[in-house]
């Protein structure tokens, strides 16, 4: 639908932003950034530049590895950053298996249509008391936010309690996410939005490891 709308508006099959009407009407000034403001360590800047240009040397790797810190229990809740979901999932399941307590599985529900690739959390949420978890949705009462970390403190068939890093413990309610379809109305030249389904599940996921993509969204 979005493609049909853009094709109708711009009368072209090229949908690059610089071909938009807004850009064409602007007196666009091009600026190239050359000075780094976030770092003042010249040696570190040189390493970062080599990484960016794919020219990393063995010395660069050694310098970075020298600063690797292996987390200990004293570090508290720490997270492993993974490049892909598959790696993060593997680490999380390994850590979950290490906990010697009863496992509970909470299964989400779908009403209508909701694509699996759009699930905000797992359809089958596997948890144990002591598991490190992350909230995936803001709380309306502002007790936690998307990305808040905690540990599972109590589990029953119908109830999950999580203790946040600040020491506060809450019973976590289920949440529903909505899925929409979009259709372009050529006569009105507008996109029409229609609710097609909902997905209901606890807003939690195992969080010993998360993807870099997810971590960037938390900052």
Enumerate the language-model features and the residues they cover.
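Conserved ATP-binding/catalytic motifs of P-loop helicase motor domains
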Residues: 1-219
């Amino acid at each position: 639908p979005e493609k049909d709308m853009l094709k109708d508006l711009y009368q072209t099959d090229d949908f690059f932003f610089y071909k938009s009407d807004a850009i064409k009407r602007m007196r666009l000034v091009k600026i190239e950034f050359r000075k780094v403001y976030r770092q003042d360590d010249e040696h570190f800047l040189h390493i970062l530049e080599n990484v960016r240009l794919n020219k990393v040397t063995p010395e660069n790797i050694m310098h970075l590895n020298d600063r690797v810190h292996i987390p200990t229990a004293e570090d508290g809740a720490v997270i492993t950053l993974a490049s892909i979901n598959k790696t993060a999932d593997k680490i999380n399941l390994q850590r979950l298996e290490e906990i010697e307590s009863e496992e509970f599985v909470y299964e989400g529900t779908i009403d209508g249509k909701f694509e699996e690739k759009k699930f905000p959390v797992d359809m089958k949420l596997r948890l144990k008391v002591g598991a490190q978890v992350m909230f995936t949705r803001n709380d309306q009462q502002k007790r936690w936010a998307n990305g808040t970390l905690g540990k599972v403190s109590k589990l029953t068939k119908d109830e999950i309690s999580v203790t946040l890093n600040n020491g506060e413990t809450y019973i976590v309610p289920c949440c529903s996410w909505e899925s929409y379809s979009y259709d372009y109305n050529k006569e009105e030249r507008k996109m029409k939005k229609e609710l097609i389904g909902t997905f209901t599940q606890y807003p939690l996921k195992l969080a010993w490891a998360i993807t870099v993509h997810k971590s960037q969204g938390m900052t």
